[in-house]
């Protein structure tokens, strides 16, 4: 949604405000998912043996910035949080992202959360055992600006997320993956995906659903439950970008019910559930 983001900023909505709203939506969905997992664990197997660990994996762009906000908010809400920056810290150059990164560093120094920087696969693999303890994994690695084959250390992060989810399920332990905007890496315009690709249980995107998920059944499967969250973008920011069909973005977090079959020509304009399609936040 890069063009819409830029238009919203020209109207006076700051990048920091957009990122804060997106991170708040991710936090709300994460807390709901943790509640669901806790209820599941309270069945015959008994309650969770220890407080659930939330692992937030962040890439270097705006998508990662949304993850930084979510990590901060989850830690502030009293959750056990491990935040891993899967990039060189020097790439945190955007003003909003850099601000949130600085706040997280201060929180980590105070013991409010665990924070790691893993710009190489080798450093990321040192966290393998800790990541494997996660009850909820938040994928904030890449946004819509990514293209081509996955590069390291992102590819290793994708493998770790999928392995953690698979092994937890095999052991009967509650574990879910929450994707920010889209699982890494699904093309939000056409629905194609990288190899490897994260398989999520729930995806939260922002402002409007993305056409790629209406176009591709496999993309929908990989996304899991697909939620659209408002982040305060005015309709005026869409002028000349999203066709005006009279449909409004949701006023609260809303799950999309995809309509089958979806014609490609229609889906290029509408992303199911009456929500027009639009590009996602950049990586």
Range-by-range predicted roles:
Residues 16, 89, 185:
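Positions that flank functional sites
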Residues 1-53, 259, 267-270, 280-283:
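An N-terminal, well-structured beta->alpha segment
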Residues 28-143, 149-180:
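Nucleotide and nucleotide-moiety/phosphate-recognizing core
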Residues 12, 16, 20-24, 68, ...:
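Electropositive phosphate-/nucleotide-binding environments in soluble metabolic enzymes
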Residues 2, 133-283:
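YjeF_N-associated NAD(P)HX repair module
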């Amino acid at each position: 949604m890069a063009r819409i983001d830029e238009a919203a900023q020209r109207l006076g909505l700051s990048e920091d405000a957009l990122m804060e709203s997106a991170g708040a939506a991710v936090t709300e969905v994460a807390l709901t998912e943790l509640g669901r997992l806790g209820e599941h664990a309270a069945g015959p197997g008994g309650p969770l043996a220890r407080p659930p660990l939330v692992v937030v994996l962040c890439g270097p762009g705006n998508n990662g910035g949304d993850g930084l906000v979510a990590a901060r908010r989850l830690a502030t809400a009293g959750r056990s949080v491990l935040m891993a920056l899967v990039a060189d810290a020097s790439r945190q150059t955007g003003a909003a992202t850099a601000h949130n990164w600085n706040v997280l560093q201060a929180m980590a120094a105070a013991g409010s959360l665990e924070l790691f920087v893993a710009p190489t696969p080798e450093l990321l693999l040192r966290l393998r055992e800790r990541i494997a303890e996660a009850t909820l994994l938040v994928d904030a690695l890449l946004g819509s600006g990514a293209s081509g084959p996955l590069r390291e250390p992102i590819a290793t992060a994708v493998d770790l997320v999928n392995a953690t989810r698979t092994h937890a399920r095999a052991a009967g332990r509650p574990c879910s993956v929450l994707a920010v905007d889209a699982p890494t890496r699904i093309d939000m315009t056409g629905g194609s995906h990288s190899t490897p690709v994260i398989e999520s249980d729930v995806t939260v995107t922002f402002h409007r659903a993305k056409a790629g998920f209406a176009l591709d059944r496999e993309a929908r499967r990989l996304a899991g439950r697909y939620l659209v969250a408002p982040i305060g973008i005015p309709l005026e920011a869409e002028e000349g970008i999203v066709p005006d069909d009279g449909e409004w973005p949701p006023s609260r977090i809303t799950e999309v019910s995809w309509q089958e079959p979806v014609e490609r020509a229609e889906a290029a304009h509408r992303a199911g559930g009456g929500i027009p399609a639009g590009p996602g936040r950049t990586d």
